[in-house]
Amino acid sequence: FIISHNAANTEPTRYFAWVTVDVVGLEGKRFWQVEEQFIAEGFAADRLIVTATHNHQAPDTIGLWGDPINEISGRDPVYMERITESIEQAVREAAANMLPSQLSVAATSMAEQSLFLTGTKHGGFHPNADAKGMLNDIRDPRIVSDRLLTLQANHLETGSTILTLTNWSGHPEVGGGNDNAISADWVGVTRIALEEHYGGMAIHLPEALGGMQSALFMDLPLINEQGLEQFELCTETDISNSENPFDCFEKEP
């Protein structure tokens, strides 16, 4: 996305472009080439910001998951080049489709949204006792940052949503490490939900992930027929064999 503080149809002198990529991390050389291209076209390189969502379910972009014993990197050179090309393409597409908008920001604590997102150690009902606002700091010292920051851009004339941006500190690793499926993890699911609800485009920027703020094993509660949040107490087989699947759910505390 691109944000410019200039009036519409004027020369852009105050602007920045921000690209976020659904991968575990990126080295600077992935976008230095893009910066050089933009400099050649008269744009300031320091106005380009590139971040990674730290997604653990994407192809390896750092070399973390190869075969270190045999000195084999997990990175695919062809895929890495594709990322560089995609960063440039994303900026150009955003620049070609800029719209006058009004920005609004909001922040909340995830722990304040529901006691079912927080474990018993913090006064909630989540089955993971250490959970706080859908997060668990799995290393000492245990410090949880459960703040959710959002920014939304709405069209200045129609009010329609152009962009919804989220900023939260949960590691995108809820898919675990025992599969070869490629996805954007919870970031991808969140993006789909936000775009279906608000319209426009949804983008996620990671907060202070640290060492570490983990969303792993943070099951979401289900919603029963009465609209109450509950966690299931039985297996998928139990549910499929039951005449009333809601019998498998815990009563509201």
Where are these regions (language model features)?
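Conserved beta-alpha junction segments in alpha/beta enzyme cores
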Residues: F1-P253
